[in-house]
Amino acid sequence: MGFTVNHIDSTLAPYAEKSYQHYLADAKEYGITDAERYAQDKTLKEIKQGVQSYTYELAQTQNALGQTPFTTISFGLDTSKWGREITRAILEDRMSPDNRDVFPKLVFMYRGEINGDPESPNYDLYKLSLECSSKKLYPDYLSFSADDIKGEHYRRDVYERSGQTIAPMGCRAHLSPFINPETGKDVTDGRFNIGAISLNPVKFALESKDINGDFDQEKFDALVEKYSNMVFDILNWRYERVGNLYGSSNPLFWCEGGAWQRIKTTQQVKESNLLDGATASIGYTGLYEMVNAMKGDNWQNVSDDERHQLQAEFLSHVNRIREERSKADKHPYALYSTPAESLVFTWEKLLTKQYGVISGVTDRDYLTNSFHQPVWIHSSAIDKIDYEKEFHQLAKGGHISYAEFNYGVAPTSLEAIVNYAMRQGMYFGVNVINSVCDDCGQHGDFLMTCDHCGSENILVVERVCGYLTYSKRSGVQAVNDGKWSEIKERVRHGVKRGQLGSASYAESH
């Protein structure tokens, strides 16, 4: 998880207008010819420099472990003059060949009549965004349209009801809809998540065998109940713990406008409604391996439909427990698809140590992330979207899907795929390998050595989970062994329905 500045275009646009009026007044005072053009040029320059300074300051801010703050900005729906120019400046800054930033994460908010349709006012910015994604991976795309979802879709429904946008916190965490009881209005900004704990359904499946080694569904369901309730007991304690904090523990957040409601430094959080708008999340990972563990030696014969059904049944079961505990504890719990940057490696090693190497379960260096189609499966991007779209609706507290493409994939191809994902109401990202050679300056799709000069002194930007990171710095691996194995096994997805993807990096090099 991380920190998000939602609708940054709309947030900053009024200040750009103030700058414009300031420069316009100066131009008129000093008799500058074409005062409007002067004021506009100065304001555009200020916007550009502001974006550059903002990203630079974030990159230079690090904790004792050398970590950069996990930050996200969302934009794309503001059709005002300055809102559009702020969006344009963000995209053009990230597209610069010299820009190697991975933070802030960029999220383009999609709504057909605003930026997705060719005749929409911000369509040019959507096209620019796709061009940026084709080489720099970001922005990701967040749907506020969901045209193919006929039932409830909470982001779209909140937006259509109130005009408010729900943006992800960090890479994928989402807050549930919340209405301020005092005003009756939706609250989407100034809210927060107080923690996430993950389940290990692969272990549950391995533990759910009878004396003959056959899978026992009742035992599995009992383990899901037991450990889910254990998680909610801990999260309930977490709410109590946060509720006992005083405003003075973090005055910038609790007292000075960071949160959606303010308290005094001498007040406890529980004396307000602040926690009514907070969530705590139950996560999970490894659904692909969970099904394989259920099926034992027959796992290779499981159809996609059966696998999909078993994964959906698990999530539905956890959701039922979540709803019961939310009602009993009076807290807004959420089901969250854990990013598991290191957990997929750690859990695989622990499972292997306890159960040995099991075909389809512990025979790789990692578990498959959350509900995702495994990275080594050859399919089209559209087919992958179809496989994963239901899980976005089941795990509303955190989700993202992405597809793999070649560096510099044609924006027109991306547009068709992103449009399809947006019609399904998804949160969707574009994956390419974005590498830079520190010796010759070559940009491209290479993971081990520069494809121009052969140097190993390369910087590789990859999506490790929802965030981008440097998987290699100066030619040295910078992620855990499990994630590195997964990155090398990723296949490129076809751009048309039914079109199989190209070979993985390991197969093609």
Specify the residue positions occupied by each region the protein language model found:
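Short intrinsically disordered, low-complexity coil segments enriched in acidic
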Residues: 1-5, 284, 311, 335, ...
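Contiguous, well-ordered alpha-helical segments that form the cores/surfaces of helical PPI scaffolds
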Residues: 279-293, 316, 463
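Conserved catalytic cores of very large enzyme subunits
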Residues: 1-276, 297, 304-308, 312-460, ...
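Glycine-centered flexibility sites
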Residues: 283-286, 397, 466, 482
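Long insertion/accessory domains within large nucleic-acid-processing enzymes
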Residues: 448-507
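Metallocofactor- and cofactor-centric catalytic cores in central/energy metabolism, strongly enriched
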Residues: 45-55, 292-293, 480-487
